[in-house]
Amino acid sequence: MADYLSVTQLTKYLKLKFDRDPYLERVYLTGQVSNFRKRPNHQYFSLKDEGAVIQATMWAGAYKKLGFDLEEGMKLNVVGRIQLYEPNGSYSIIIEKAEPDGIGALALQFEQLRQKLAGEGFFDERHKQALPQFVTKVGVVTSPSGAVIRDIITTISRRFPGVSILLFPTKVQGEGAAQEVAANIARANQREDLDLLIVGRGGGSIEDLWAFNEEIVVQAIFESRLPVISSVGHETDTTLADFVADRRAATPTAAAELATPITKTDIVSWIAEQQNRSYQACLRYIRQGQERVDKLSYSVMFRQPERLYDAYSQRLDRLTTSLMTTFKETLSEAKQEHLILEHRLASVNVQARLERYQDRLATAHRLLIANMTNQYDSKLAGFERAQAALLSLDTSRIIARGYALLKKDGAVAACVKDIKKGDHLSIVMRDGQLEVEVEDVNEKNI
């Protein structure tokens, strides 16, 4: 009689086979991403082709190492192991590595990041800075031992020997290179003596140049206060640093030429040209002046110089005559006014009028004093009457004379009709207060 297996037994047996099969421990598989929805950590989706579908799992650690984003419909080449899930008997592939089919992972990562940064405006022309025409000090972020810095020094020294170069020694490839490039760009921007910044390295593979495609480097160049020239790789190489930089140079030599657009020779030629222009302008000015002198020397004014001031002399004579006439008329009018005033003063008895005013002032003073005294006495008497009335209403004075004050609920009780049997009253006396309860109320007319 045949032995029957339980479903669990069969599933465990199959899982054991899966786990021990060397061909299933490392599987190379090609398929199209399906049912993908990005999750915060682990990723779960399907890989399919025309004839079949397999479930796929990528743990968070493996997904972070991808370098590009998975997308629905993307065709992948993956490496992983096959695993059987016992509860439902399904199998799936645990993906350890993946790259796009037909295109390198770095190329895809480059394109995805380029589109993202372009959408955020990092490469817009409106953010580009103009390069200065004259520089005194140039910063260079590159390797201290490569040909890049030698080419830059040689070119700038040849074109404009007075320009200083400040090197920021930088790791330009490998782990940590992007962070070092970004940090040195930030350091350069902290200096006040730099006019320009060159960021670059020599040629290499896409992996060698990858530090200049990292978002941290793009961000540092974008935020740079100093204008930035990018010179990464050869002429055919293009990095994201080239897109965001203010200018891109195909070679280090070209970068140095962009940094010094005007050479020492250009300045010497310009100075010579300006000297020649100044010399020619001086000659023209001297010739024109000589022509004017010659013209004036033959004029009537130079041959008869007294004619230059004849008109001014005549005008001075007229003004002198007019001034003397005006002065005499003004003096005559002043004398007449003086005589009139003397006549008026003589007709007025000033002393008598002054005495009358003094008498009137003394009388007014006496009346004012008397009036003020009467008002003061009247006001004082009124005040004393009001004070006496107020003192007569002072309860403390009344109580001091032997009377008592009756209060109900804190208020003065003045009438029997306001009090009823059982009320609690306070009797305020000269030396204290009594608390009493009313036992009976008798209303009597007094």
Swiss-Prot record:
One GO BP annotation of this record: DNA catabolic process
Catalytic activities: Exonucleolytic cleavage in either 5'- to 3'- or 3'- to 5'-direction to yield nucleoside 5'-phosphates
Keyword line: Cytoplasm, Exonuclease, Hydrolase, Nuclease
Pfam families: Exonuc_VII_L, tRNA_anti_2
Subcellular location: Cytoplasm
UniProt superkingdom: Bacteria
Coiled coil: none
EC number: 3.1.11.6
GO cellular component: cytoplasm; exodeoxyribonuclease VII complex
GO molecular function: exodeoxyribonuclease VII activity; nucleic acid binding
InterPro entries registered for this protein in UniProt: Exonuc_VII_L, Exonuc_VII_lsu_C, OB-fold_nuc-bd_dom
Cited function: Bidirectionally degrades single-stranded DNA into large acid-insoluble oligonucleotides, which are then degraded further into small acid-soluble oligonucleotides.
Family under the similarity heading: Belongs to the XseA family.
Subunit structure: Heterooligomer composed of large and small subunits.
Protein name: Exodeoxyribonuclease 7 large subunit
Annotated organism of origin: Streptococcus equi subsp. zooepidemicus (strain MGCS10565)
High-level lineage: Bacteria, Bacillati, Bacillota, Bacilli, Lactobacillales
Gene from which the chain derives: xseA
